[in-house]
Amino acid sequence: MFLKFHRSPGLPDVLAVCDAELLNTTLKKGDVNVQISESFYGNLRVTEEEVKEALRKAENINLMGERAVALAIAAGLASRADCIMIGTVPHVQIYRL
């Protein structure tokens, strides 16, 4: 998986995680194209344990892919019903308020 924290002064960090095979691909659903880019998901390849640790700390989370989403579900942060499918790929966004 690839992971990147987006940091902006005065705003909560955003954690972006995608499954490795999705990086630099484009997903399609109807008229919508979603680019899974290195600029958003980063180029830092991480283990499941590193993703789990990041999920514990993050306030805003963007996950793309079966493995990334499954970690959030296993951690109790999301459910399958919270996901949308982009083609055959699950995607979920989590916001802690």
Predicted regions and their residues:
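Conserved mixed alpha/beta catalytic, RNA-binding, or beta-rich assembly cores of soluble enzyme
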Residues: 1-49
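Solvent-exposed alpha-helices and their adjacent loops that cap or buttress functional pockets
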Residues: 6-10, 53-56, 84-85
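Short, surface-exposed beta-edge/turn micro-motifs
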Residues: 11-14, 58-60, 89
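Fold-independent oxyanion-binding glycine-rich loops
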Residues: 18-20, 64-67, 97
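Short, surface-exposed linear patches
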Residues: 36-41, 57, 83-87
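Short C-terminal domain-edge/linker segments immediately following a structured domain
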Residues: 45-51, 65, 92-96
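Mid-chain, well-packed structural core segment of small domains
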Residues: 49-75
